[in-house]
Regions:
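PP2C/PPM-type serine/threonine phosphatase catalytic domain
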Residues: 1-284
Length: 284
């Protein structure tokens, strides 16, 4: 499977905060249609040096993927686990008494011969939108207290956005070997031209719900116009808010692609033998 993307679009806004704790990769203004991975990290609010943690994780993960991943090949979950461990080790090396509480969320989009692999920790979101059907095909499950309460049936989906506990996350990347949170990993092979992949920090969701998001991506406007609409829709946000969205230009099959699903299953099975252990899913 060979996936071509359009020019990626980045949003990187300070909001009403004094400092920017979000980090994105590629850096704003540097992404091209030749990039094969996209990273977003949101430094944990209320924790010291959240901006340091988000920068360390995004940069160290990007460095590992650049050095060890060939997008023309199937990327195994074992490689992802090694990349994540490298990011955790970078956090450990930066750990000191002044920064011991630093932490960050993580979102990753990784395009490769096997399709798209997504990985996330925390409450930063990943979406797969199909404008031709005018619907969301996939939304990542937040690692947060309110999402756990929603799953347990104690609050409604709408109440998650207004709950006083909405900022409490249950997983984050932090230094210290006792703090190795597991990511959620999803493999997506049903990709079509015109689809969008969207990653965002929770700040982007203050004034943009799923219906509005789906409507925006389903419009006939250009990607640059969609980016400007997202910026306008989130202009009054209090929190830092950042995002990347990537449009699929084309999807084609090549020699050997008939064995991709078996290869992916083998990769996931092998991933169970490494640390951290993944929660992997297939999305048809």
């Amino acid at each position: 499977m060979k996936i071509a993307i359009r020019q990626p679009q980045a949003i990187y806004e300070l909001g009403q905060r004094d400092n920017q704790e979000d980090s994105i990769w590629p850096l704003q203004g540097q992404a091209t249609d030749q990039d094969f991975f996209f990273i977003l990290c949101d430094g944990m609010g209320g924790h010291e040096h959240g901006e340091v943690a988000s920068r360390i994780v995004s940069q160290s993960l990007a460095q590992y993927l650049r050095d060890h991943v060939n997008p023309e090949e199937i990327v195994s979950d074992q490689v992802l686990g090694e990349a994540l461990e490298a990011a955790y080790q970078a956090l450990d090396q930066a750990d000191d008494e002044a920064a011991k509480k630093m932490g960050t969320t993580l979102c990753l989009l990784l395009f490769h011969r096997g399709g798209l692999t997504t990985m996330h920790i925390g409450d930063s979101r990943i979406y797969h939108v199909r404008p031709s059907a005018k619907k969301l095909l996939y939304q990542s499950k937040d690692h947060s207290l309110v999402y756990d309460l929603y799953q347990a049936g104690e609050i409604s989906y709408e109440e998650m956005a207004t709950s006083p506990q909405k900022n409490i996350i249950t997983r984050a990347m932090q230094p210290g070997k006792d703090n190795r949170c597991k990511p959620s990993v999803v493999h997506i092979t049903d990709l079509r031209p015109g689809d969008y992949l969207y990653i965002c920090s929770d700040g982007m969701l203050e004034q943009m719900d799923n219906d509005a998001l789906c409507q925006l991506f389903s419009s006939q406007d250009s990607d640059e116009a969609k980016r400007q609409q997202l910026i306008e829709a989130t202009k009054g946000n209090k929190d830092n808010h950042s995002a990347y969205f990537v449009g699929i230009a084309s999807v084609s099959s090549g020699e050997g692609d008939e064995s991709l699903l078996d290869d992916e299953q083998t990769s996931k099975d092998n991933a169970l033998n490494i640390r951290p252990v993944f929660e992997a899913e297939e999305v048809a």
